[in-house]
A protein has these predicted regions:
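Short, His- and charge-rich active-site/binding loops that engage polyanionic ligands
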Residues: 31, 35-40, 45-47, 80, ...
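Active-site segment of metal-dependent pyrophosphate-handling enzymes
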Residues: 15-17, 63-66, 70-125, 165-173
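A eukaryotic nuclear recognition-module signature that targets compact all-alpha binding cores
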Residues: 45-51, 160-172, 183
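Active-site-proximal cofactor/substrate-binding loop regions of enzyme domains
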Residues: 50-53, 61, 65
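Conserved small/polar residues in nucleotide/adenosyl-binding loops
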Residues: 191-193
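N-terminal strand-loop-strand
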Residues: 7-48
Length: 193
């Protein structure tokens, strides 16, 4: 097949994984975020992002997602499933995000294609205990502010995916609920989704 745009360079993509972990604390849905700190043009900033990172050359996507989630949050053996790829050329259009990533990865970064993973969990003391030694925390979905990169879009797409999935497979809701739950908790989880 002939390249119709002969003068257009091929993309030099990096591949990353981003994990959307949605939890229910018995009252509301929350998303697991990690804190990000940096300096940009002399200003120190603190914001948040999804647990995510570039993948290593020798690892599979699923392995990378588990590794990244563990390294950034302390959570392991979480049931993650791929739900969408994000490859917009504008994913790295914010210079602050690019500079932060290049400092963190110690590498020049141009375009990033991310494979988004999704998990639904019940928030309990055991799960929270794993987060204690990491810069990770639960944030109510309604309270999520502007995140790094396109992570707000990824969360929005994850919630759309969950709504569609639950419509055909309501048993997915049981991942959010404690072993013993009330009808009110079930109803609340449905309302928030």
């Amino acid at each position: 097949m002939q390249n119709l745009q002969k003068n257009t360079p091929l993309a030099n993509n990096h591949i990353s994984v981003d994990c959307v972990v949605i939890g229910f604390d018995g009252e509301q849905l929350k998303v697991l975020l990690v804190k990000r700190a940096g300096e940009d043009n002399g200003e120190v900033y603190h914001d948040m992002k999804l647990p995510g990172s570039l993948i290593y050359m020798d690892e599979a996507l699923d392995e990378a997602a588990q590794r990244v989630l563990y390294e950034l949050t302390g959570l392991k053996n979480v049931n993650l499933m791929q739900f969408k790829a994000f490859g917009s050329k504008n994913r790295t259009s914010n210079p602050k995000d690019v500079r932060w990533l290049e400092r963190a990865m110690q590498s020049k970064v141009e375009r990033i294609v991310t494979i988004a993973y999704l998990s639904m969990v019940k928030i309990d003391r055991t799960l929270d205990k794993n987060l204690d030694d990491h810069q990770a925390c639960w944030v109510a979905l309604k309270d999520v502010k502007t995140l790094a990169f396109d992570h707000n879009l990824i969360i929005k797409e994850a919630m759309t995916y969950i709504r569609q999935f639950v419509e055909f497979n309501p048993s997915m809701l049981f991942e959010l609920l404690p072993r013993k739950f009330t009808a009110a908790q079930l109803r609340l989880s449905l309302i928030h989704i």
